[in-house]
Amino acid sequence: MIINYKFSDFYFDKKLSGKEVEFSIQIQKREASSDKNLQSKNLIIDAINVQRDFSEKNKSSDNLEILNKQIEDKNDLIINLEKKVFDLTLENKKNIDDFNEKAKSFAKKAQEELDKYKLELKSFLENEFEEKKKFSFQKLFENIINPLNNFRLAIDAGSKQENSSIKSYVQGFEMLLNQTINILESYGLIIIRPEIGDTFNPEVHNAVELREEGTPNRILKINSLGYQFHERVLKPASVIVSK
């Protein structure tokens, strides 16, 4: 049997209050009862059971709707989280790419600086080697110039003697001195030979005496020659200078 039923506005279940519903009632054959009141109670109980069944079904439907809404909300949350993860992944990749690019640039500059340093070091060592090689005989020349000077002074003094035998010895010594100087010059020794009247140069001349004579700052007399090894002065020429 199909029955249309409208629930009262004051029905205890707020979800059903004021609503009109349609439901079916299955009436089972019962044994006849002579008690009219009992028959009436049975009908009321059947109606209440139908209402309860409907209420439970409606409640289940509402619960399903709530559950679907929760699932939808969770899906939205998952989508948002996935988007954030994707954005962070892109940002992280960009940061990694930027870092790799900077690392490559730094490594390139570091390699360039290292290569430059290697070239400078190589050049320095080569120059240092050449410098040491160039002046390797300096100590020898420093030790030999004083005896060489004394030998020259002795020759100059002997050449002024009237004795022919002494002069012959002096000539032989002078030849030996010139040969020695030629050999030393081939290894970089330079004789500083000032001339009388030359301008005094403090870098290669040593003024042992000043005289008020002639043009100022001129060489008046040479006491001894000077020596230098390549561009290094080992012993300046000893001179007398006008002031």
From Swiss-Prot:
Which subcellular locations apply to this protein?
Cytoplasm
An example Gene Ontology molecular-function term? adenyl-nucleotide exchange factor activity
The record's annotation in SUPFAM superfamilies points to:
Coiled-coil domain of nucleotide exchange factor GrpE, Head domain of nucleotide exchange factor GrpE
Q: Which UniProt keywords apply?
A: Chaperone, Cytoplasm, Stress response
Its Gene Ontology cellular component terms are: cytoplasm
Swiss-Prot/TrEMBL GO biological process terms = protein folding
Q: Which CDD domains match?
A: GrpE
Q: Quaternary state and partners of this protein?
A: Homodimer.
Q: What does this protein do?
A: Participates actively in the response to hyperosmotic and heat shock by preventing the aggregation of stress-denatured proteins, in association with DnaK and GrpE. It is the nucleotide exchange factor for DnaK and may function as a thermosensor. Unfolded proteins bind initially to DnaJ; upon interaction with the DnaJ-bound protein, DnaK hydrolyzes its bound ATP, resulting in the formation of a stable complex. GrpE releases ADP from DnaK; ATP binding to DnaK triggers the release of the substrate protein, thus completing the reaction cycle.
Q: Which family does it belong to?
A: Belongs to the GrpE family.
Instruction: Please identify the protein, giving its name as recorded.
Output: Protein GrpE
